[in-house]
């Protein structure tokens, strides 16, 4: 019948541990399929997919340039992001949460450049990502004939001289300060400065805003129309509700799951350990030199975290004793 029965091998995820975490979250959610109303289950699934798309993208932006520098994917995943739980654009926590997102936004250019480096080597070598990273670190000849050929092809497709369009004279002027034989560097610079490069940045910003469900009850990012309030990491009430449902599950020795209660601190630590989202950074290595104001911000954030849990019905003050302040499962698997 002329049907192509050959199937290309499905590529493995670039960040394997992050993909495994997404799979585990979906498995945990499926444990509730007979206990949750269908609309609630679908909403949790939607929120989880958005969360993991956003986290995966943020981690690739952070880790890919490091992987190229080291020549391997086998790096420690030390990505983290402060999340502001106060729902107040001018809170004491907001500047620290904004700074983490600003750091990510400032690295977009380096990330986009890294993707072009990967693409150029894979187009040349037709190899997998691990070999590409090794090649970039150990063997890449920046004056290679392949890069010269691609660069010349781009140049030859430009008009010789045009007052309205980017032409060969403009390209020569743009590359005049490069080493004459650095064809790889020149090619990267041309790609970065092209409409393709600027388009990638705009797409990346729009994609993260969408995946993180910015400014919605399910949000991982928030901002306002004012430049005074740029993007910052947050955990919206619906997202927090979804995470709590997953984190009150504990795996038993026989491999099955049961629901359990968690203290406020245990829940905050679980969110940090599992997703890299920092609510209380007082014990974080990143903030070992934190001043009094930053420590006060984290204490304020923990109080806001507690209030948000109270608002969504997972937490009731039963005692002043910290040990008795527990997050109790809304749906029990043992029922």
Question: In which residue ranges do the predicted regions lie?
Answer:
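Residues within HEAT/ARM-like alpha-solenoid scaffolds
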Residues: 234, 262, 297-300
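Short acidic, hydrophobic short linear motifs in intrinsically disordered regions
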Residues: 257-274, 278-290
């Amino acid at each position: 019948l002329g049907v192509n029965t050959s199937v290309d091998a499905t590529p493995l995820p670039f960040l394997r541990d992050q993909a495994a975490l997404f799979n585990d979250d979906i498995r945990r959610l499926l444990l509730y399929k007979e206990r949750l109303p269908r609309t609630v289950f679908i909403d949790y699934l939607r929120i989880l997919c958005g969360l993991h798309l956003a986290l995966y993208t943020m981690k690739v932006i952070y880790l890919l340039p490091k992987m190229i520098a080291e020549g391997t994917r086998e790096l420690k995943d030390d990505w983290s992001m402060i999340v502001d739980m106060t729902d107040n654009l001018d809170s004491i926590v907001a500047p620290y949460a904004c700074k983490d997102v600003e750091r990510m936004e400032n690295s977009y250019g380096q990330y986009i450049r890294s993707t072009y480096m990967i693409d150029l080597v894979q187009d040349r070598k037709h190899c997998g990502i691990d070999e590409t990273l090794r090649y970039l670190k150990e063997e890449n000849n920046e004056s290679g004939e392949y890069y010269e050929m691609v660069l010349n092809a781009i140049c030859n497709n430009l008009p010789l001289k045009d007052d309205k369009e980017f032409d060969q004279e403009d390209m020569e002027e743009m590359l005049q300060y490069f080493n004459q034989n650095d064809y790889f560097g020149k090619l990267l610079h041309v790609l970065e400065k092209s409409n393709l490069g600027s388009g990638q940045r705009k797409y990346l910003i729009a994609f993260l805003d969408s995946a993180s469900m910015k400014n919605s009850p399910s949000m991982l990012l928030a901002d306002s129309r004012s430049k005074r309030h740029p993007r910052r990491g947050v955990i919206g009430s619906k997202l927090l509700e979804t995470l709590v449902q997953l984190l009150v599950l504990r795996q038993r020795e026989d491999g099955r799951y049961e629901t359990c209660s968690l203290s406020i601190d245990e829940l905050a630590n679980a969110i940090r350990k599992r997703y890299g989202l920092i609510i209380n950074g007082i014990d974080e290595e990143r903030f070992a030199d934190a001043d009094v104001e930053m420590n006060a911000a984290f204490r304020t954030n923990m109080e806001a975290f507690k209030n948000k849990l109270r608002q969504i019905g997972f937490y009731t003050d039963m005692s002043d004793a910290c040990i008795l302040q527990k997050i109790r499962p809304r749906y029990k698997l043992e029922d």
